[in-house]
Amino acid sequence: MTGKWWLWIAVMASAFDGTTATSAQPATPRAITNTAGLRLVVDADNARPVLRVLLPGKSESDRSIEVIFPEHVSGRRHAQADVEQLYLFRPGSSGARPAWRQQGQAVVYDMELAGAVRLMARATLEDDGVRFRYEFRNRSTVSYDMIYAVTDPRLTSSFHDVRLERTYVHHADGFDLLGSETPARLSMPLTNWLPARYLVSFTWPVPSQRVERRGDGITYYNKSRAVDEPFIATLSADRAWVVASVARDVGNVWSNPELTCQHVDPQVPLAGNGQAVTEIKMLIVRGSLADAHSRAVAQRMSLK
């Protein structure tokens, strides 16, 4: 058979299996590099949006800093009690990929969510980390009293901190380990410690119950005093690097220690036929905890 005949067969076969002879999946943008040598990479192994940030000298396959962008989007309609999920990340290569675009030092994509909400997500590599921005456009007359996208940075390798020995928050009197009020976490069997969530209030009232064991099988630990800034940071094992997350305003900050994730997820209202924006900054700094904190303080009010 001629090459043209084989090509015709491939094209006809693709009409029946939903593919095309040449891949119809959008191209993955190239890695973006900043002046400090950090690289921002769109993860090609997952169809749904995942980013990786590579420290200087790390290979492009490194997953020490992986960000699900976002892990989910949820909202609560006006005058309703229940929160509804508008999007949920699912790992793996199956499914449609977003059409990523590179715009200078940023990667951008658009996604249609449930509830007639359109999301434009932008991740910009800055000199000291990544700024994540979510723009919501409501195409219906239904108002949401609140909507939020959960940015999910997951830290492994030298940043992995399953017993919260290097993960800090900031109170009015200075830094404190997120898990400081649970000293038993350092010695209890991991099967007793995990699964867990450790939370600390910022604007929300501090829960009266310090430890909650809920029906989902997860133990929730609530710190007894609020933080004075929506900031959470994890040091690398050698104390050379800091990964920290900061937002302008949130209800609380928290972590799942098994994943060493950092959550500072703003919630905003979204009017019918309206627009809303949220942002967070993930700082990645070669330096001290104080260095990362000073940058967070300086940049916090620039966030949406």
State the predicted function of each range.
Residues 15, 20-26:
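Boundary at the C-terminal end of the N-terminal hydrophobic targeting segment
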Residues 115, 138-140, 157, 282-286:
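Beta-strand elements of well-folded, non-transmembrane domains
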Residues 125-126, 130-186:
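Acidic (Asp/Glu-rich), glycine- and aromatic
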Residues 165-219:
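Low-complexity, serine/threonine/proline-enriched polar segments
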Residues 6-17:
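Bacterial N-terminal signal peptides
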Residues 75-127, 143-147, 158:
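Extended, loop-rich substrate-binding clefts of extracytoplasmic carbohydrate-active enzymes
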Residues 26-97:
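Acidic-aromatic substrate-binding/catalytic surfaces of carbohydrate-active enzymes
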